[in-house]
Amino acid sequence: MSQALRPQAIKTSTTGSSLADILERVLDKGIVIAGDITVSVGSVELLSIRIRLLVASVDKAKEIGINWWESDPYLSSRTQELLASNQQLLERVNLLERELAATKATGVIKKGVLGTPFFIWFYDLV
């Protein structure tokens, strides 16, 4: 008439969770670790370290507004492209500076309307 009581297994929060599952949850939610370390002798503080560590997935970091790796040229996949572009710009600036120096040597610089300089070019007509 009465049912026999059978012992039931105790359920824990880690049942069926592997390391990969836990890591996925941590990266999905994000975790912040904060700490302060101070080294002092007597009342003189010698060293103070403030540690703030955020562990999160890239998607979660972007969601909370952290995306510094996108603008850092050393971490970007476009590093080579940016370096090549910078080299081209430097070469162009050098060329323009040489042309300006040559113009100053052969042309006359006068003050124009409202005091802005303009160049009078001298050409050799053949």
Curated annotation (Swiss-Prot):
InterPro entries to which the protein is assigned, alphabetical: Gas-vesicle_GvpA-like, GvpA, GvpA-like_CS
Keyword Nucleotide-binding: no
Organism of derivation: Pseudanabaena galeata (strain PCC 6901)
Name by which UniProt lists this protein: Gas vesicle protein J
UniProt entry keywords in alphabetical sequence: Gas vesicle
GO cellular component: gas vesicle; vesicle membrane
Main function: A minor component of the gas vesicle, might be involved in nucleating gas vesicle formation. Gas vesicles (GV) are hollow, gas filled proteinaceous nanostructures. During planktonic growth they allow positioning of the organism at a favorable depth for light or nutrient acquisition.
Superkingdom to which the source organism belongs: Bacteria
Family statement: Belongs to the gas vesicle GvpA family.
Gene behind this protein: gvpJ
A GO term, aspect molecular function: structural molecule activity
Assembly and interaction partners: Interacts with GvpA.
Disulfide bond entries: none
Annotated compartments: Gas vesicle
